[in-house]
Amino acid sequence: AHSLAIVYTAPIFVTLASAWFLREPMPQRKWGGVALTVAGVAILASFEPAWSARMAFGDLLALGSAITFGLYSVAGRSQRAAYPLLTYAGWVYGLAALWALPAAAVHFNPAVYGWQQILAVVGLGILPLGAGHTLYNAALRRVHATYANLVATQEVTGGVILGILLLGEIPSPSSIIGALITLVGIGLVIL
């Protein structure tokens, strides 16, 4: 729960980086909506303020992920005029694949993974991951990076909805309240 809540502090870093690097500040009246969305995700993810050294390390990694996601978002927005969407996405995904290839090669064991598992991983990489990130980058070209990033926080709400539809899981009252708070926060920013 910590990592999910911390990773979705990314809208804060996107908003700060957009103002700093892109000279696209967020009006002060909209900061409350950003904070409300982040708080809603924390409630939705059932954030519990517990602590241990191991949890602190994981929390630090999650914070690094949030900052990196923020910088990725701002970098994508900054390149909107320089490259067409699919050219930009192709370079980003190609370089990411090259970066991950050594780790994948070291840990690949053909005796463990059959062709069905490999096809499933490739399919997940191309369809939901590739299409989702390409649509996210398309949104970054059209709206303030914070707006696109706030909508991305709804991955968590989408996961809850999929849990209801596919697994019959009933969300807790705090999950429902958290999802509603995120939607109100997004509404305050966008409207």
Annotate the PLM regions.
Residues 1-10, 55-68, 116-129, 180-182:
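Structural signature of hydrophobic alpha-helical transmembrane segments
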Residues 45-57, 104-121, 164, 168-173:
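Membrane-interface helix termini and inter-helical loops of multi-pass transporters
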Residues 20-22, 26, 79, 88, ...:
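Hydrophobic/aromatic residues within transmembrane alpha-helices
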Residues 14-16, 34, 50-108, 121, ...:
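Transmembrane alpha-helical segments that form core, pore/gating elements
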Residues 3-9, 75-97, 129-165:
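Helix-helix packing/entry segments at the starts of transmembrane helices
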Residues 13, 36, 42-43, 61, ...:
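Hydrophobic residues within membrane-embedded alpha-helical segments of Major Facilitator Superfamily
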Residues 16-17, 26-47, 100, 122, ...:
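Hydrophobic transmembrane alpha-helices of multi-pass small-molecule transport proteins
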Residues 6-9, 29-32, 57, 64, ...:
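Hydrophobic core positions of alpha-helical segments in small-molecule transporters
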